Design a protein with these regions (language model features):
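Bacterial Sec-dependent N-terminal signal peptides
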Residues: 1-23
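Short proline/glycine-enriched turn/loop motifs at strand-loop junctions of beta-rich domains
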Residues: 66-72
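Short, surface-exposed loop/turn motifs with a glycine/proline- and acidic-biased composition
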Residues: 91-110
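Edge beta-strands of extracellular beta-sandwich domains
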Residues: 117-125
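Transition segment at domain starts
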Residues: 19-55
Length: 125
């Protein structure tokens, strides 16, 4: 029983994430994936031992599990946190956004892709 409680406490230390296509075409939850070498090395982020990501097959959004940064591999038009725009950019695949200075709490992130698909997610630091 103590091991179960300790395990659950450990899980609560990590941010939690969920993502959904706001256009209603696709409902997805980001899956926490263990480092599998080739996948992350392909994007030159092999130092991420554990990450949460959304993968539609065409685009990918990866959030480092400690909540310090966002990594995306999709043509991003804009990113906002709690309705505050933090990035407006029409080009640039594979950029990293540092969110380590954010205070602890819950955040809603909206990512608009080049095809104007909007993805809304929640994460907690």
């Amino acid at each position: 029983m103590k091991k179960i409680i300790a395990f659950l406490a450990m899980l609560m230390m990590f941010p939690t994430f969920s993502f959904a296509d706001r256009n209603g075409e696709e409902q997805v939850t980001l899956q926490k994936k263990k480092h599998n070498g080739a996948h992350f090395e392909h994007y030159a982020i092999a130092d991420m031992p554990d990450a949460v990501y959304y993968d539609s097959g065409e685009s990918e959004i990866i959030i480092v599990a400690d909540g310090t940064s966002l990594y995306y591999n999709v043509e991003i038009v804009s990113i906002s946190l709690n309705q505050t725009m933090i990035l407006t950019q029409v080009d640039g695949y594979g950029d990293t956004i540092d969110v380590s200075s954010l205070p602890a709490g819950s955040y809603t992130i909206v990512i608009t892709s080049e095809f104007l698909n909007e993805y809304e997610g929640q994460f907690t630091i």
